[in-house]
C-alpha cells in the first residue's frame, strides 16, 4: 500500500528534525565552543575544513551543470560567487584563508592542503561526486544542512573570542558573512526541495540524502578527533610523518 505523502509543512518539519544529527553535537565541535580545544586542534580543524570550503564551489558547479532550469541557475550561481568572490569582492575561500592566518597557520600551507587528513578528503570527495552523479534536485537538497548552519556560526562568534583570545579578530569575518548567506541559501534550497519531492517515496529518499550529508560532516570530525584529540593520525603506529596522499593521484 502506497503511503500518503507528507504535506509541505510536515516534510519541512521532518527535514528540520535531522538537526538532531548535525555536527554541532559532535564532541570535537562541543569542545571548541566550550573552550577546551588546544591551539593544535583549532588549527587542525581550520586546515581540514579548508578542503571542504574549496570544494563547495565545485559541488555547486555540478548542480548548475545538471540543472536545465535557467531561473534556478540564476539564483544558485550566487553560491559560487559567495565562495570564489566576484569582481572587487572577496569570497568565502579568501575569508577562510584569513581565518587560517588568524589562528597561526601559514597561508601557503593551507593552500598546499598538506594537513588535510585522508578521512576528511574522502568525505568531501564523496560529497562532490554525489553532486555530479545525482539529479540536480537531489544535489540541491543535500545542501539543506544549511538549515542548521546559522546556529553553529553564531556559537563560534559568541564563544571563540572569549575562550581563544589568541585568535586575531579579523579571522571571524567568514562566520559573520555566512550568517546572512546561509539563511538566504536555506530559503532557496528549501523552496526547491519542497516543490520537487512531493511523493512519500521521494520524500523518504530526500531525508536519506540529507542524512548522507550529515554523515559526511560527522565523519570529517571523527577523522579530526582521531588525529588531534586521541593523537592517532593516519599511520601513527609506524611513523610521525604525514605520509598520506595529497589527492594528486586522483
UniProtKB/Swiss-Prot annotation:
Record-linked InterPro entries: Haem_Oase-like_multi-hlx, PqqC, PqqC-like, Thiaminase-2/PQQC
Catalytic activity, reaction form: 6-(2-amino-2-carboxyethyl)-7,8-dioxo-1,2,3,4,7,8-hexahydroquinoline-2,4-dicarboxylate + 3 O2 = pyrroloquinoline quinone + 2 H2O2 + 2 H2O + H(+)
Superkingdom in the source lineage: Bacteria
A molecular function (GO) term: pyrroloquinoline-quinone synthase activity
Pathway(s) of this molecule: Cofactor biosynthesis; pyrroloquinoline quinone biosynthesis
GO BP annotations listed: pyrroloquinoline quinone biosynthetic process; sulfur compound metabolic process
Keyword terms of this UniProt record: Oxidoreductase, PQQ biosynthesis
Entry EC no(s): 1.3.3.11
Coiled-coil spans in chain: none
Pfam families hit by this protein: TENA_THI-4
Disulfide-linked positions: none
Family: Belongs to the PqqC family.
Entry function: Ring cyclization and eight-electron oxidation of 3a-(2-amino-2-carboxyethyl)-4,5-dioxo-4,5,6,7,8,9-hexahydroquinoline-7,9-dicarboxylic-acid to PQQ.
Protein name: Pyrroloquinoline-quinone synthase
